[in-house]
Design a protein with these regions (language model features):
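Short, small/polar-rich loop/turn modules that mediate ligand/substrate recognition or access, typified
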Residues: 1-55, 96-117, 191-200
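Residue-level signal for well-ordered alpha-helical segments
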Residues: 30, 34, 59, 149-151
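Conserved helix-loop functional segments at active or binding sites
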Residues: 55-62
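PLD/PLD-like phosphodiesterase catalytic module centered on the HKD motif
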Residues: 2-6, 62-65, 75-200
Length: 200
C-alpha cells in the first residue's frame, strides 16, 4: 500500500497505539497525487465500515449486482437492506460460511444458518462454502454494473460487534471502473467459490 492510503492506515494504527499507551511515530511524507484513472481506495474502520456498507447496498439499482462472501452475517440493518435490494431487482448472491467449525472448535451454525434461512425465504440466492474443518473466512461485498464497481473488504464480519465500535476493524473501500483488474480479480474469486470451480 502506498500514497494517501498508506498514510490513512498509519493514522488508524496511531489511534490504536495511543489507546494501548504505545507509540507509533508519524512518518513525514510529501503530498501524493491520486491517479483518478485508477480505482480510488478509502480506509474504513469500525462504524465507518457499517455506514459505507449500508450505503453501498441501499444505493444499488436494478441493473446492479451484489456479491457478498462473509464469515459471519447477522447485523440486522444490513440483512434488511439486502432483502430490500433484492426486492428492487438487484441481482444478489450471498456466499456464507456454514458456521459449523471455527478455529478447530465445533459450532452450531449461529448466526449464518438463521440469516441464510431468512434471506432464502425472501428469494435471495444463498450458498454455503464447502468447508471441511476450515473456515470460509472471506469478508467482501462487491457491487457492480457495466460501468462502475464498488467493493468493501477487510477484517470486519457483518455483525453488530464488528460494525458498531465494539471491536477494532480495518477495511478498504475501492471504487472505480468495472474493467479494473481489482474488480475482475474479486469477481473471479467470488465466481470460483460460488460455483466451486476449483472443486474444493
Amino acid at each position: 500500500v502506498t500514497g494517501n492510503t498508506a498514510i490513512d492506515v498509519l493514522k488508524t494504527e496511531q489511534v490504536v497505539g495511543k489507546m494501548s499507551k504505545g507509540d507509533v511515530p508519524m512518518v513525514i511524507v510529501g503530498e501524493f497525487e491520486a491517479n483518478k484513472q485508477q480505482p480510488q481506495v478509502q480506509v474504513l474502520t469500525e462504524k465507518a465500515i457499517y455506514e459505507a456498507t449500508l450505503k453501498l447496498i441501499e444505493s444499488s439499482q436494478k441493473n446492479d449486482q451484489i456479491h457478498l462472501a462473509m464469515f459471519y452475517l447477522s447485523e440486522r440493518q444490513i440483512v434488511k437492506a439486502l432483502i430490500s435490494a433484492h426486492e428492487r431487482g438487484v441481482k444478489l448472491q450471498v456466499l456464507l460460511d456454514p458456521n459449523k467449525d471455527a478455529f478447530g472448535r465445533e459450532k452450531n451454525g449461529i448466526p449464518n444458518r438463521q440469516v441464510a434461512s431468512e434471506l432464502n425465504e425472501a428469494g435471495v440466492q444463498v450458498r454455503w462454502c464447502n468447508t471441511q474443518g476450515e473456515q470460509c473466512h472471506s469478508k467482501m461485498i462487491l457491487k457492480s454494473n457495466i460501468q462502475q464497481s464498488e467493493m468493501i473488504l477487510g477484517s470486519a464480519n457483518f455483525t453488530a460487534r464488528n460494525l458498531k465500535n465494539y471491536n477494532l476493524e480495518t477495511n478498504i473501500r475501492v471504487v472505480g471502473n468495472s474493467s479494473a483488474d481489482v474488480f475482475k480479480d474479486a469477481q473471479s474469486y467470488f465466481n470460483t467459490a460460488w460455483s466451486n470451480l476449483d472443486a474444493k
